[in-house]
Amino acid sequence: MKIISGGVCAAKGFKASGVHCGIRKNRTKRDLALIYSEKVANAAAVYTTNLVKGAPLVVTKNHIADGKAQAVICNSGNANTCNANGVEIAERTSDLLASVLGIKPADIVVASTGVIGQPLNITPIASGIPALKAGLGDHSDQAAEAIMTTDTIPKEIAVSFEIGGVECKMGGIAKGSGMIHPNMATMLVFITTDCAISSEMLQKALSSDIAETFNMISIDGDTSTNDMVTVLANGLAGNKEISKEGDDFNEFMKALNTITVWLCRRIAADGEGATTVSYTHLTLPTKLEV
């Protein structure tokens, strides 16, 4: 396994873009991101444990209940949470994107991050979606920038690894610098891979990994409403699909863990007001004496 460039566009068949659509007042700040797979991918996700859940999360959870997705759209600057028409706006966002991309609305992950309780106007999103499509390319950096809120740096990484002698790639982007507390918190993480793995095993891998990565970091003790970690696997690497535990699954887990640990550390290092990052390594004794 080795670290490579490309972020979420490192894996075959994935493109990304990021634009300023007008949600944020600063015109130099991108505020709308898109990640797109040329074919429908298997998908897995984990979500915030906050009892109050943002409208985009509710919509996404419903969309990928079948373990499938083809695109991710995320806006920054407004969380679309605690709004009377929040679900309607999130669904409208996916409908507009689906129409432009020629895919199913149900195959779209919708995410938002930003101010809670402020109405989200669909107009800037509607005007920004065509630009997102036009800008699709190897632009993981644009997407990483567009999902930032109080972050000071974009966060992206990619790795290459082998499954059964076939080269596979995996990449991820993340946002988060405040309201970071165990059991998710204000974090959005989007991971892509061209490795062929069933949606069931993908979910198993993600759920297992999260317990030892994102659910272990804390910055300020606050848990947010919108946040999720999502993985899309389109299988374009051409390896034999991972459908059970074994050596191939273990190699996939190693790659996933490399991505998540790196992103976790970048989030912690970028914490609001953070000057020092602490890592604690515990070694349990092999034998206990009474």
Task: For every predicted segment, state its role.
Residues 1-47:
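N-terminal amphipathic/basic leader segments beginning at the initiator methionine
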Residues 35-67:
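Active-site-flanking structural segment that lines cofactor/substrate pockets
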Residues 52-63, 88-100, 203-216, 255-264:
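Short, well-ordered amphipathic alpha-helical segments that serve as non-catalytic structural scaffolds
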Residues 70-77, 107-113, 227-233, 273-279:
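Glycine- and acidic-rich phosphate- and metal-coordinating loops
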Residues 100-214, 224:
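Glycine-rich, mobile lid/loop segments that gate access to catalytic sites or pores
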Residues 193, 233-236:
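Channel- or pocket-lining gating/hinge segments that regulate access to a cavity or pore
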Residues 215-218, 236-268:
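Glycine- and Gly-Pro-enriched alpha-helical subdomains that act as flexible
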Residues 280-286:
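Conserved small/polar residues in nucleotide/adenosyl-binding loops
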